[in-house]
Amino acid sequence: MNAQEANFDGLVGPTHNYAGLSFGNVASLNNEKSAANPKAAAKQGLRKMKQLADLGFAQGVLPPQERPSLRLLRELGFSGKDADVIAKAAKQAPELLAAASSASAMWTANAATVSPSADTSDGRVHFTPANLCSKLHRAIEHEATRRTLSTLFADPAHFAVHEALTGTPALGDEGAANHTRFCAEYGKPGIEFFVYGRAEYRRGPEPKRFPARQTFEASRAVAHRHGLAEEATVYAQQDPDVIDAGVFHNDVISVGNRDTLFTHERAFVNKQAIYDTLTAALDARGARLNVIEVPEAAVSVNDAVTSYLFNSQLLSRADGSQVLVVPQECRENGNVAAYLDELAAGNGPIHDVLVFDLRESMKNGGGPACLRLRVVLNEAERAAVTSNVWINDTLFTSLDTWIDRHYRDRLAPEDLADPALLEESRTALDELTQILRVGSLYDFQR
């Protein structure tokens, strides 16, 4: 059956701010305590969605999670009415209020790992929400993620939405940011590629400066859950030195699509063995792997991290050609810009480069790839998604005006203590559930 890759982007939430919560994420740390612009952030992401939808790509949207999380703050011992809880947290532990207020669920590449029905043993699309247990502000996301995915992908004949793995360091799971899929065509069986930073029960190299967030054990558990064929599943370790350079997820150093792997030469441990394994596995599935390896001499790891060259979307057009979606920071880095010009002018599979202004997300360490969750759907599966989440002219206009009505254009760290922000966010999200037709998705609606 014909299938298409859909991208479900996270809509940036009303509490988007720069709290520097993500150790190992250089941009996040560098912009700590800056004032953010939630309205601009949401509009930048929405305009990327709309332009890609206009180009014929299947583009969906995922709603923000409720923030600040009063559930977390109450769990941490702050009590009283909602306004009292926020006031106490702001006074006694502002770092915990910042964690409870993070809009990080916007980066849906970390929402879950997704395996299409062509790859799974029961012929359904499988989702495993990521536990994101390495960071408090992200570890609180998986329950709401599961609720959202279960709402959008509700038909059990087509979809299986699992619980997150147990939130322990041995099973640290960061979702699709460390996973990609190679195939001849989206609707045919493919190769699922899992990248991890360390193994809990195997000796091997590990980073020394920043933590490795994804474990081999978590990746293997997800593959087993999804019923993936062993011969069609490949595991690779990310080079610990690039993790220490700020590559906190694999999607900061490589991206894959169909038969193409676009990667930096320093991305992996034992890279040639990985290329050979992927080539053999994909050959058995009827396709030939095309590796585009960017040399350190052309683009350094530091260039890759500051420009987010590899935190890009690699998309296939109907004619089989591929387009690379990059942030504008790639055009502002001389080495990266020169490389992209050469890439687009060459004879390889990537013929075009699209550039987007995602500055607000980028300042927190999230480029085009961070903002989207890839879900391959055949025609019957797409028809089973009945919520109003597919971007078109009407939905774009509704969301754009919704942002204008509800979002602030400035949010500084001290503004998180404003109890009005909670009410503003709830009012906005309550209206959003009606626009997207997702029912009572949030705790405050129940």
Swiss-Prot record:
UniProt pathway annotation: Amino-acid degradation; L-arginine degradation via AST pathway; L-glutamate and succinate from L-arginine: step 2/5
E.C. code: 3.5.3.23
Record's keyword terms, sorted: Arginine metabolism, Hydrolase
Main EC class the enzyme belongs to: hydrolase
Binding site residues for substrate: 19-28, 110, 137-138, 213, 251, 364
Active site location: E174, H249, C370
Entry annotated with the keyword Hydrolase: yes
One Pfam family recorded for the sequence: AstB
Catalytic activity: N(2)-succinyl-L-arginine + 2 H2O + 2 H(+) = N(2)-succinyl-L-ornithine + 2 NH4(+) + CO2
GO molecular function, one term: N-succinylarginine dihydrolase activity
Organism superkingdom: Bacteria
Biological-process GO terms, alphabetical: arginine catabolic process to glutamate; arginine catabolic process to succinate
PANTHER family to which the protein is assigned, alphabetical: N-SUCCINYLARGININE DIHYDROLASE
Subunit note: Homodimer.
Role: Catalyzes the hydrolysis of N(2)-succinylarginine into N(2)-succinylornithine, ammonia and CO(2).
Similarity comment: Belongs to the succinylarginine dihydrolase family.
Protein name per its UniProtKB record: N-succinylarginine dihydrolase
Native source organism of the sequence: Burkholderia lata (strain ATCC 17760 / DSM 23089 / LMG 22485 / NCIMB 9086 / R18194 / 383)
Source organism phylogeny: Bacteria, Pseudomonadati, Pseudomonadota, Betaproteobacteria, Burkholderiales
Name of the gene: astB
